[in-house]
């Protein structure tokens, strides 16, 4: 049987991790990954539900797949099996079958380990529509195979899933379930595995990774700081990052680790969502503007060169001009070096979705103002490195022939022209920064490297 797999990933780094694990899982069943959807016998869309636009992208893609299926039939080929995985599948369930009957399997983010069994049922011809949306977190990791290959020199490892915070705008507690942390040794073994395959950097990921509370082999509960210190013992791992955190779970132990653990990179993504205490309360964020800025100040005292990244939502129901100005001032005071900003998007089933909504025009106007400020802040952050020599981990080819791209410790992309055809992929090399834009740095290998 022709077993060709195509997978398209939407959304967060957790979804990227899940897609990689689905590939590992199905490769053990004889599937080969293909780059062209038209060549696939199985097509997986691993979906995101965080914003309305993200889920609509999936339906648009399903429309294109239906046209592809028709072309296959005309050419005398069989249809590909279509799988909707991830958070849209979890949130919308059988409604997807109603809207798009061409979909064969719907599987949630905690139950995709059952894909081999579900595909076997499809092959037997006894079923045409299958669905599995169980929240059985431990089973997922216990039943997945070992990572077969680290996709890049920077590997993602899921350590924590789900969220118990219930922010009023967010679907994560409903699509990913309650907070669950993997055992310490299980995470360590996975990091060791990808390190032995060439990964130099590990990114510990979770919906609320700073709430990690996995247990060691003796049943003792461990914090994220404990996990980072343990993973740092792996010699081949040179860089450690973690994402995404919640301010309420940033303990003194974790903050202090930024000053003492040399493998922990001087970068932190810490979403704030709003600079207004009124809006933070309406969002059920459970922290204040002042507390957030205290954390940032503490981090900068511990690690003066740290770069802070964040997420901000504009146009949340109830946000007025004064609230928006508070967000602008917080972004400036926090000196975000990077920031992802979005218009509020109603998500069905969340408390904020039923409130009085702000007009699209006002949301777009505020977003434009905020993004202009953030772009300038990011440019200024990048320009500070001009003339300096920084260690860069090269992990991918650039847009142009001979160009290679890597990351600084501060998560900035660095482009160089690899004119001497040196094999820099997977290496940490000192680079002198020559110029900077808001999105990238440009440099050359430092002569003394």
From Swiss-Prot:
SUPFAM superfamilies, A to Z: Radical SAM enzymes
GO annotation, cellular component aspect: cytosol
Pfam family, one: Radical_SAM
Domain spans labelled TRAM: 383-447
Gene3D superfamilies on file: Methylthiotransferase, N-terminal domain, tm_1862 like domain
Cofactor mode of binding and number, as noted: Binds 2 [4Fe-4S] clusters. One cluster is coordinated with 3 cysteines and an exchangeable S-adenosyl-L-methionine.
PANTHER family found in the cross-reference section: CDK5 REGULATORY SUBUNIT-ASSOCIATED PROTEIN 1 (PTHR43020), MITOCHONDRIAL TRNA METHYLTHIOTRANSFERASE CDK5RAP1 (PTHR43020:SF2)
The name this protein goes by in its record: tRNA-2-methylthio-N(6)-dimethylallyladenosine synthase
The species this protein was found in: Orientia tsutsugamushi (strain Ikeda) (Rickettsia tsutsugamushi)
